[in-house]
């Protein structure tokens, strides 16, 4: 193998690795802000996802296996009303307008603060 060929292979390998690392670090950020009016039976959350908007958002309470659809309101706020007190921490599953799907577990704690913004651990 010639020196030029070996050097080209090394450069190509480094370029591929750089692209892989860049892709891993460029995952869009998602945040969940608990909105005013949330209480033990009503949860209102503003979901922000960099570069995209939510098409569907589902909620799963702590200890439950059931995902329930949230209702989209004004300004990107998603709400859920329950007859029983809601049990956190809360898990979210969503589909964006661009087709990205994701699940985030235990994002909003049981004892959340109105106006606080929560982000999944990376």
Swiss-Prot record:
Tissue distribution of the protein: Pollen specific.
Determine if Isomerase is one of this entry's keywords: no
* Cellular compartments annotated: Secreted
Biological process per Gene Ontology, one example term? plant-type cell wall loosening
Listed under GO cellular component are: extracellular region
Give the keywords, sorted: Allergen, Secreted, Signal
Q: List the disulfide bonds.
A: none
The record's similarity note reads:
Belongs to the expansin family. Expansin B subfamily.
The entry's protein name is Pollen allergen Phl p 2
Per the UniProt record, the source organism is: Phleum pratense
């Amino acid at each position: 193998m010639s020196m030029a060929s070996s050097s080209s292979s090394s450069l190509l390998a480094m370029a591929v690795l750089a692209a892989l690392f860049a892709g891993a670090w460029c995952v869009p950020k998602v945040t969940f802000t608990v909105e005013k009016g949330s209480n033990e039976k009503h949860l209102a959350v503003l979901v922000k996802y960099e570069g995209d908007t939510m098409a569907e958002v589902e909620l799963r309470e702590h200890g439950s296996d059931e995902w329930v659809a949230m209702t989209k309101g004004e300004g990107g706020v998603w709400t859920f009303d329950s007859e029983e007190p809601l049990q956190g921490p809360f898990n979210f599953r969503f589909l964006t307008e661009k087709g990205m799907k994701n699940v985030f577990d235990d994002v909003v704690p049981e004892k959340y603060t109105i106006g606080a913004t929560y982000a999944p651990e990376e």
